[in-house]
């Protein structure tokens, strides 16, 4: 789960991380009175969307008068902001964060992530802040600093000292950086975060370190322990089909292709998407119905897939272990009769009760294309939509 910048800063401040401060606006009629509450010479108006690249797209404006700030805020509120992360459709700006500006002497990058490949927590830092870290990693990888934390021992003093040293901090600033590392680590652990990113972390004209922008992504599996964080969820920033799927207990991610996929198991789902690409087409989604799906969940899964107007065909790939193939077959038939599947549908079943499932499908009277293995299924669905 993602949250907005102003929410991320609120959490970080609770853990002792110094951040820039401001006020959030969620209604256009509140813009003027909100800006009037700020006593500053420089105003920073920031669009609040769950995507990076806001500055380059015009979603962050720095102005030097109250009246100019009001005009910029009114112009920005409600627009469709298109960044390199939103795609061409953009994201509507329903919230603004208006901050007091500050003098910047130097910008840094600092983040903490769970590194799945190394099975540990990793700090990533760079003296090149305020730009895309991916660009820095590609062009000047030597400027990327990494420190891994063994989960068995946790954060140690040498991690904090090492990060401060590698970033070139000395004396009081080194002490500040060590405290920020400790605070960010504590926030990461205690909130079940998957990533905390501060970009940029700045040194201001007073020599103080400050988080000027912040992003936090949370592990969805840990949200049950954090109702206060769950309450920060902004459903307007999420794909409505993904929200609908989550409410139905389905794992769904919309993609840019035209072949809808319904699979049980994340690994099998990824293999299915890969083989669709191998045969010359693109998946429209990742959809894992899980191991305990019943007839109604299968029916809802197909409805969600067909709600995507880009879908020209559907590939169902089920390995019946915990899930029985006959249950899947009944769900497919129920969905087909209820909503009327008007695109090619290829079904590949294997495992528990596969013969019964195939019999149910063949006797349904519906135009369902059977497949014997994954390669056969991918070939048939790609040919069917051509």
Swiss-Prot record:
Binds 1 Mg(2+) ion per subunit. Gene3D superfamilies: ATP-grasp fold, A domain, ATP-grasp fold, B domain, Succinyl-CoA synthetase domains. ATP binds at residues 46, 53-55, 99, 102, 107. One of its GO terms (biological process) is succinyl-CoA metabolic process. InterPro entries: ATP-grasp (IPR011761), ATP-grasp_succ-CoA_synth-type (IPR013650), ATP_grasp_subdomain_1 (IPR013815), Succ-CoA_synthase_bsu_CS (IPR017866), SUCC_ACL_C (IPR005811), Succ_CoA_ligase-like_bsu (IPR005809), Succinyl-CoA_synth-like (IPR016102). Its EC number is 6.2.1.5. Mg(2+) binds at residues 199, 213. GO terms for molecular function: ATP binding; magnesium ion binding; succinate-CoA ligase (ADP-forming) activity; succinate-CoA ligase (GDP-forming) activity. It catalyses: succinate + ATP + CoA = succinyl-CoA + ADP + phosphate; GTP + succinate + CoA = succinyl-CoA + GDP + phosphate. GO terms for cellular component: cytosol; succinate-CoA ligase complex. It comes from the Bacteria. Its cofactor is Mg(2+). Substrate binds at residues 264, 321-323. Pathway: Carbohydrate metabolism; tricarboxylic acid cycle; succinate from succinyl-CoA (ligase route): step 1/1. Keywords: ATP-binding, Ligase, Magnesium, Metal-binding, Nucleotide-binding, Tricarboxylic acid cycle. Succinyl-CoA synthetase functions in the citric acid cycle (TCA), coupling the hydrolysis of succinyl-CoA to the synthesis of either ATP or GTP and thus represents the only step of substrate-level phosphorylation in the TCA. The beta subunit provides nucleotide specificity of the enzyme and binds the substrate succinate, while the binding sites for coenzyme A and phosphate are found in the alpha subunit. Heterotetramer of two alpha and two beta subunits. Belongs to the succinate/malate CoA ligase beta subunit family. This is Succinate--CoA ligase [ADP-forming] subunit beta.
